[in-house]
């Protein structure tokens, strides 16, 4: 394969703008799926949580061949919480395809990845997707994208970007606008040809000393650690002697490559050699980490290490100490939790883990609430049992002054909900930056708000907008501390003893607040069973039964009516709790509890 026949592109899109569907179409139309093969939808989101939530978490690769050119496609996460994945994915490509919904326009998460791509000097190709939607406004999207690039400091060359109109779900693309309701182009060839024309081919020299930077890691029980990266120059072959270096100042560690694999469709195919521009997987080296350079032992040419954004949120992961501990989980000890977190660090670069002074409690720092709850959800599905504390933001000290992370929030809401949302964001120390009505009864609000103010806001936002609002946020900068933000408005109902919940007890508590539990659920002293209708905590008896006597009551007894409980998901629990509370996570249940279970312990701690 000559060098000119390779193109490496990344696809950038906001959640639900149709990126994964678009990749499905590119794979189909390039003939990657043979006629007899079963075509799976959303091939790129192959992790169980990704399929359920419809979000991309891990940066993944696939490759298609179009008119003799090998195109490597790198799928990037659209969410700022996975910034670590985004930066590494972009280090492997020469151009980016920015996919934007023809109705919604550019969103904050798109902005995050686009800013990174433009800063690296990558040239964008704009794809306006879903142009067949009834509310599509392609002209608005193209202008909004131009303004966005300009704001993010794009060069004149980057601002002269090609535009492709497409409908990913129907499998067509076009370079010119057509009539609404009609098909504007025959197939995806317009997009393929634009990529070949505008993405520069790799310029590396195959005869130069090898230079391969590892951008992602994988693990296989058969061959051990697998490194994924793009060859900048030189040629790599199986059984070749190399050195591994952590940047120009790193110490060279000798090693030997075992296998070299390249991407073909979604498959990994063994290769006898690979040259500049190819994205390869290699194994046989145990000392590889993210950002290291694999280079020639005689004339090493290491690249600088990849820079990843610092974490902004921290949580404590603790051993589960509740009376129900060990009943539902397979892995419950602090050693098992610690080992699992160390394993996660091998490929989750934006994560930090450290031990605390207290035994069985580890401090885990990440890029945001979603980043950490996805890790918890993965651990829970693997059979882990633990408790976690309320998330806290990571503060910085600048010139002796306390600084905190500020987020940029975009809320798309109906005009009737505008007052309530603005009041709630104001209470959380948010500053309104921009307000833009779309002329169709909806309005877009842009706020700058402390990251602390967003913890627990998602649930409140959904209630305020009756589920019709869209909100997304992105880290902006560190600024001086903005002062105290009020906590939760309601207190909680706390169980006074252990046992099973009875319908009779719930009936008596119905007017006290909303419940998290249902009849026959096990409870223990100190467990949170509901939200109190007032602002104080209340200890209640959720296990009481009706006293039976030998008197018969005239008339039929009234049936007990109870309100259905609030479903407590992992995200809801983490957002809901206060500093003196924990979320207990097991493979089967999510429970909320007080940190100190008995009332006497709570009083002592509160002094």
What are these regions (language model features)?
Residues 38-42, 152-164, 202-213, 249-263, ...:
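Interdomain boundary/hinge elements
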Residues 4-18, 80, 106-115, 121-123, ...:
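Conserved structured catalytic cores and adjacent interaction surfaces
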Residues 123, 133-196:
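Canonical P-loop GTPase G-domain recognition
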Residues 211-315, 325-327, 490, 498-549, ...:
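Conserved nucleotide-binding/hydrolysis modules and their immediate coupling elements
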Residues 1-100, 104-106, 144, 217-220:
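P-loop NTPase switch module centered on the Walker A-proximal segment
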Residues 322-345, 559, 563:
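A short, contiguous, amphipathic alpha-helix enriched in charged residues
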Residues 25-26, 63, 85-88, 92, ...:
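Alpha-helical scaffold elements adjacent to nucleotide-binding pockets in ATP/GTP-utilizing enzyme cores
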Residues 16, 22, 54, 73-75, ...:
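Residue-level signature of catalytic and energy-coupling elements of molecular machines
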